[in-house]
Amino acid sequence: YKDYVPSHYELGFQLVSYADRRYDEYIGASITRYTSDYPILIFTTQLALNKYYGTSTRQLFRETFSSLNELWDSLPDTGNSPRVVSPPVKIYTTYSHPLYVNDSTLLVLKEDYDRASRFVEIDLHSGQERTVCYTGPVSTRPVFRNGTVVWTEYRQSTVWEQKVDSRLCVMQYGDDRYRQEASFGDGVLYPVLTDDGDLAFVRYHYDGHYSVELHSRERGTLRTHFDESVSLHGLAWDDLTQCFYYIALSDDGMSIGGVDFSGLKGRRFPVTSPAYVTVNNLSAGDGMLYFNSIYSGKDEAHTIDLSTGRQYRISESRYGSFAPSPSPGGEFVALTTYERDGYKTALQEVEYWEEVEWTPVPRNVVNAPLKPWDVPVVDDVVFTEEELNASMEKHPAERYSKAGHLFNLHSWAPLYYSPDRLMENSTLDAQFGATLISQNLLGTTEASLGYGYTLDGHSTVRGRFAYYGWAPKIEVTALWSDHPHQTINTASSPFYTSYYKGNSFDLSVRAYLPLLLSSGYRIRSLVPTLQFNLDNTEIITPEGQSNRASLVLASVQYNEYVRKARLDLQPRWGYTLRASTVSNPFSKLFATAWSVYGRVYTPGLFLHHGLTLAAAYQRTTDVFPMINVIDFQPRGYDQIATTSYFAASADYLFPVAYPDWGVSGVFFLKRISLDLSFQYARYLEPEYFIDLTGTAGNGLQKRGVPRHIYTFGGAVSLDIAPFRMPAE
């Protein structure tokens, strides 16, 4: 949390490429083979490195960066030609896609560990910064023209969480609020505005191809479609040439092209030839194109003069410069440049440092030379139609059987715990034992089976199966224990008696339909739920019949809260509302109850502190009591039988320390936090009913006697990354 952590892909590339030079082979193959041969072992990477190469992950890391530091120290220190204009920062910060609003004001996207993604204004005269508005997850860069800002954000499908689209966002500058435009549909990328107010953008189609669309007020909608082998990664509008320009990626590499919509159909023309040189963040103005390119070995700002077709590098950076955008007069470009504490907003005077000649690949400056692999170049491999037909005959296509692929055992743990609880609320209720974990390749089913042994000598077996392939999600959980189940004898009037015998089991079947209603900075959801619970708690009726405890619960929950920053422990603002009802349709001994619950998130006294207030109220519809309260109960109480119940709580959550310390290969402790809690409950205890909490002296209370519960305390939470798992 203190500093930027590169992705495991970036780090892994450097480790593997160094090992390839050091040991003259690709170590990933040996590690993968060893892992598949010995899946029962946990630290397979460490064991394989020691077995085959006599090294360890720590030693490999140190050798890799010792070699890289020697290379980097040998490079000339170029300094930074861009002049940083963003205010100093105290934490890792990312500025991106700066835009000129006028000669003295920049509009920039900003995100840091303390705050979520947002637009900020930077005054170039005073250096002051002002937050304009918070955004959702931005998918493609913003564009400003004539007082309007357009960009796109990711948006989840209402029903399918894994289905994510990109939607147009529009903000009138000065309103400090924006809206998502659903009328243009999904798959919208890289929107731009013309001087006439027309809108154009790239659209990704579900069949895999891209198109450029112009939505003109006078001419309607014009489109030009690209082959499926071509993907588009940028769009810009040039006011001088009155054309659109795009970045295309094909089998031949990346290139820049143009589209002229002056006719009835879009006429496409090339600007640069394809090359395996990465270019990004295209913008345009006054007959010039601006973008960043890896041509020189580091990302630098480039420009193309459309009148001559010549390309120039216009920045010289120590670590790279990105996303150039021209000033109104064209003398400067606003861009971002990288430093140790993040990406800074900077200005670069447009001066030609170097004319760029076409080259098939970029210069290799910051990476050590790679050893050539003795494998054919994929572009040189010819797969004829005859070979394709022969392959199809040998391996004919078959219908994928979902039922036959529900289970895929992939992991195990030498302890008993509930993987679903660990993923949902970070609760690790570990015991001695073992757990098997399964997830199918489609991600539509999850399953686990665990055996646990408690210190008091009891065994527990828990199995869970969840299916997410339909809109309503279904979860089935079964638990068996040799711990005796409870028997309540209501036939022993006037006093109920309770005793334990045999084994115990619990079965839960839950179906719910999460409706995702998120938009921008706010996350919203509506979740109706239906759940059936059955256990072998035995209830002897006054007539002497034996009933099992079973409950049917129905609830509707609505959530709304703002997106969290990286260091936030909980949302800064938000609330949850839930209405529930529960009954036992198979026994008259249980009442039907209803409950309402609410929770509110607010900021605390300091940054990343949070206050949570919650309350619940429950009533039964007749005189029979419920065994359990539906919503939350004070800590230390898990069974309260009552006809009327009210509870409230206040929790103050805050970080205590960021150790950034651990035991290599075992765990890494990132943060320690503390939750101070106060809880209160008032309920009416029923007459002649056994006190299941065991707090009463003789175990009996009278109906209607009000009871009050006060609890307070604290809970310490450890934010841990175990076993070298990626931080993100």
Q: What is each of the regions a protein language model found here?
A:
Residues 478, 491, 545-678, 682-702:
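C-terminal outer-membrane beta-barrel translocator/porin domains of Gram-negative envelope proteins
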Residues 303, 433-440, 459-479, 500-517, ...:
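Feature captures outer-membrane beta-barrel proteins of Gram-negative bacteria and organelles
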Residues 82-90, 128-133, 177-182, 220-226, ...:
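A short beta-strand motif characteristic of beta-propeller blades
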Residues 29-147:
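Beta/coil-rich, acidic/histidine-enriched accessory regions frequently appended to metallopeptidases
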Residues 92, 110-119, 134-139, 152-168, ...:
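A flexible loop/linker signature enriched in serine peptidases of the S9 family
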Residues 185, 317, 404-455, 476-482, ...:
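Transmembrane beta-strand segments that form the barrel wall of outer-membrane beta-barrel proteins
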Residues 91, 293, 354-471, 475, ...:
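Outer-membrane beta-barrel initiation region
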Residues 158-159, 299, 318-322, 340-343, ...:
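Outer-membrane beta-barrel translocator/channel fold
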